């Protein structure tokens, strides 16, 4: 339902092992709104999307992982800690490279492989002009964690 649709709008999804997700809207006289059918289709494929949307039965977190709806399943007691760990890792990333990675993946999913490769190559080249690339390389050589500035 709405919770799944909200999660489908996220770049990464971590589920507790006790979670269940579904699209029960048909039973309410509705259709999945807010991108529910379209995002689910792109993540899980046509057959799984039709099953979830037409039958309305929720699936377990483990099944959602198999379908590609979630990225990870962790014990419920560890959900917050795992989520904070992932968020901390992302926050420590080079902001320009993080944004470019998201752009490359998103654009690549909407175009042909040749166009996607050209865009990726262009973005890769742009990263060489950043202070963050120099800091990341320096930190790697010095065996320390980088301090990125977003420049």
Indicate where each model-derived feature is located.
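Helix-loop "lid/cap" segments that line or gate small-molecule binding pockets
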Residues: 52-53, 104, 108, 123-128
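Short beta-strand->loop
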Residues: 112-117
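A short structural micro-motif
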Residues: 107-108, 143-147
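Crotonase-fold acyl-CoA enzyme core
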Residues: 1-98, 129-130, 134-138, 144, ...
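A short acidic, helix-capping loop that chelates divalent metal ions and anchors anionic groups
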Residues: 25, 107-110
